[in-house]
A protein has these predicted regions:
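Helix-to-loop junction immediately C-terminal to a conserved catalytic motif
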Residues: 17
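Conserved ABC ATPase "signature" region
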Residues: 65, 69, 76-94
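Conserved catalytic motifs of ABC-family nucleotide-binding domains
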Residues: 119
Length: 213
């Protein structure tokens, strides 16, 4: 999902993940209505929220160990999967750092690891590439590609149009709270950037004189 700040991307993700009730209509995931099957759906749902959702007083590894039992993982299963994810996301060295003391990039990678821990069938990711170093971004791209190949459904938001052009099989562009475009970038002559700016407009900024001196 693409769109300018305030277009409604994060709100839509919160509705899809059950964190907010829709004003009308229903959310179905895997053919099940969220309001009737919330517990079952959440077991197969991985969410990277805008606010990240970390336990601020816990370390990185403690955050991962805390969510494992929620998804029915044993302590040993959680520890093994956490070790794999910490290695992949370059978090092993900082695994004993308290979340509130971590950099933004470390915090986001921790939240992503928490979302991936139970190998969910559906992933709802709010800006997984933003604020991430290039090496980790490449790993995340590889991970999401592998999960998609294995049958996972991944819905993510991003402002990095080049990444979206590279990985997306479907692009939805939101503008002022409405879906303005829904297309497969591989079947259109226009690139993602061209379609995006044709909808939201390409800015023509003028730098004020006082910033020039």
């Amino acid at each position: 999902m693409l769109g300018a700040n305030g277009a409604g991307k994060s709100t839509l993700l919160r509705v899809l993940s059950g964190l907010e009730e829709p004003d009308s209509g229903s959310v179905f995931i895997g053919g099940l209505a969220f309001r009737d099957h919330a517990v079952e759906i959440r077991r197969n749902l991985g969410v990277l929220p805008e606010a990240l959702g970390l336990f601020e007083s816990l370390t990185i590894i403690e955050n991962l160990m805390a969510v494992g039992p929620i998804y029915g993982l044993t302590k040993s299963e959680t520890a093994a999967r956490a070790a794999d994810l910490l290695g992949l996301l370059d978090l092993r060295q900082g695994r004993h750092t308290v979340a509130r003391n971590c950099s933004f990039g470390m915090r986001k990678k921790t939240a992503l690891a928490m979302a991936l821990l139970h190998n969910p069938k559906v992933l709802l990711l709010d800006e997984p590439f933003e604020g991430i170093d290039p090496a980790s971004s490449a790993v995340i791209e590889m991970l999401l590609g592998q999960l998609s190949s294995d049958g996972a459904t991944i819905l993510l938001t991003s402002h990095i149009l080049s990444v979206v052009q590279k990985i997306a099989t479907r692009v939805v562009i939101l503008h002022q709270g409405r879906v303005e475009s829904d297309f497969n970038p591989s079947t259109t002559d226009e690139g993602v950037e061209e379609v995006y700016f044709s909808i939201v407009g390409r800015p023509q900024p003028e730098v004020p004189d006082w910033l020039r001196s």
